[in-house]
Amino acid sequence: MAAFQPGLVHLPVTPFTPDRRVDFDRLGKLIDFHIHHGADALALPTHAGESVSLADGEKRTVIEFAVKHIAGRKPLIAHVSDAGTAIAAALARHAEAAGAAAILTTTPYYWTPPPEMILEHFAQIGAAVRLPFLVHNAPEDMAGSKVSAELMLKLIARLDNFAGLVDSSLDWQFMIDLIMEARHARPGFLLISGTELMVSAAAIGATAMLAPLAGIAPNLLRRMFDLCRQDKLFEARAAQEDIASLRQLLKAGGVASLKAALAARGRDCGIPRPPLQALDTAAAAALTRELDAMAALRDEPRGW
């Protein structure tokens, strides 16, 4: 299998119509925006794209639509996470048949299985396809289960297509331990930052990044990522600090803040599905004022 190098991966939101159906017209426009503004690859539907609020059939249709719309311009990483192993494996097979370039999954939601069953969960999903297979180590309070370096090494031994780990746990010691051992077991094993805090991740050995904020600040993210890949970590710090400020601004509202920020930048993608709650008018206006006041965003695109 040729080495998979995802680079800077943009994570589009899932646009919804006023009656909360997937808005495929706007999804196509959003995909084009990301491709035209620095994405090396796209991943969807991720948690930033409200994947847990999409029905199984909707996930399949979104992946099919994205593959056709991208039309080979960039690789698509299909996110197939589910609490059920067989459900996630079936979605992975569907994504491969649709034309995805790689598969991404996290630990099973809600359940807290023992390590041997987390290993089995990942192994069955990865074995369902021949594509590069990526595991996402999410924060434990979100995922419900913790991924260990030992478990990842066992998965390397079982799966030839296990290509790398996406980490958004911010557990730097875990990342250090994993990359030191994993690259001995599998040269070329990918460590991918699951957040925009790329400077710290790059210092450990991350070579790619998933970026939910790419819809807001694609130029800033591209600049920071390129400096990190050139090992110019000191020079990347200023951009990293600006990105950290943007993350902090949007953190409390999560997807609702992300969608409100997109609307403020002229790329309205609707509001989140329940149980998430959209920002009220006052909160959205306050967010718009804060975004407009950020000097780091002055060179970022407005509109589509």
Please place each PLM-identified region on the residue numbering.
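Short, amphipathic alpha-helical "lid/cap" segments that border enzyme active or binding sites
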Residues: 24, 28-31, 149, 284-291
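Short, flexible micro-motifs
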Residues: 10, 46-52, 167, 197, ...
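Active-site beta->alpha loop and helix N-cap motifs at the rims of alpha/beta catalytic domains
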Residues: 2-146, 301-302
